[in-house]
Amino acid sequence: MSALIDFYAKHSRLVDQIGINAILALSLSVSLQAGQLALAQAAFMGIAAYVSTILALNAHWPLLATIVVAVLVSTVVAAILAYPVRRLRGVFLAIATIGFGEIVRVIANNLKITGGAEGISGIPNDATTPVIYGALALVALVLFLLSKTKFALAVALVREDEYAARGVGIDVGAIRTLSLALGGAIAGLGGALYAHASFFITPTDFGFARMEQILVWCVVGGVTSPVGAVLGAALLSVLPEAIRFLADYREISNGVILLAVILFAPGGLSSLWRARRRTAARRVTRAAT
């Protein structure tokens, strides 16, 4: 126990970062599971971060209230965004949503209320480790419960074959909108927590580099696996710290891991676990016969 306490004392920021990154990875995983390469999570994250920060500093709202409002705002923005991009697929959807993210970043960069390029400092550090991991557990629970519903089946069918989904009466547009809105809500939660776990935020915190980072976590873990998304986020959050002794060269670690996964495990790290389970099941079946 003392060893854990010592570890947390030295690496508390990393522990918090892993929890927030896992939430952000789950937000993108929701969209990817619906077959949507919608890359606006960093924008939703930024919108919620600024809403939560402004309410905390200007209106002196408590943490929970600022998070609730921030999540609602990011959810509404995501649902609105879903309408103009509803006919886009693949790379065209990716480009459109990246463009939306850049619009959000530029607006934040030029507004007085967001602090412009200098950002906002003095944010209350209210997002403690229990709060962050409580939020992560809540997101995981909601996604688990949803995975047991007809909505999850509809999402899977839309991802695999939209025409077949329409043929059995599924409203593809509604599924895509709900998936993007849910992803926006989760990203908003991550953004609000990020703001309250940091002393300051700037528009560059929510630019394309952040979106690229979230996407890499999901690809490394497995694009259709929520567990894989969390695994990818945790691994790629810890790795740069673990190889800090490599100085500047540690920045290429994510790229090396991504390349290795694409070459040797295209389905992500979670696919290796699934393959191992299938192999074990076959061995049990053979032994039984």
Regions found by a protein language model. Name each.
Residues 17, 21, 45-50, 70-75, ...:
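Residue-level recognition of pore/gate-forming positions within transmembrane alpha-helices
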Residues 8-58, 80, 84-93, 222-226:
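Single transmembrane alpha-helix segments in multi-pass membrane proteins
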Residues 128-202:
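Helix-loop-helix "hairpin" substructures at the membrane interface of multi-pass membrane proteins
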Residues 59-102, 231-232:
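Alpha-helical transmembrane segments within multi-pass membrane transporters and channels
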Residues 180-264:
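Transmembrane alpha-helical segments in multi-pass inner-membrane proteins
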Residues 88-152, 156, 175, 286-288:
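Transmembrane helix-bundle core of multi-pass membrane transporters
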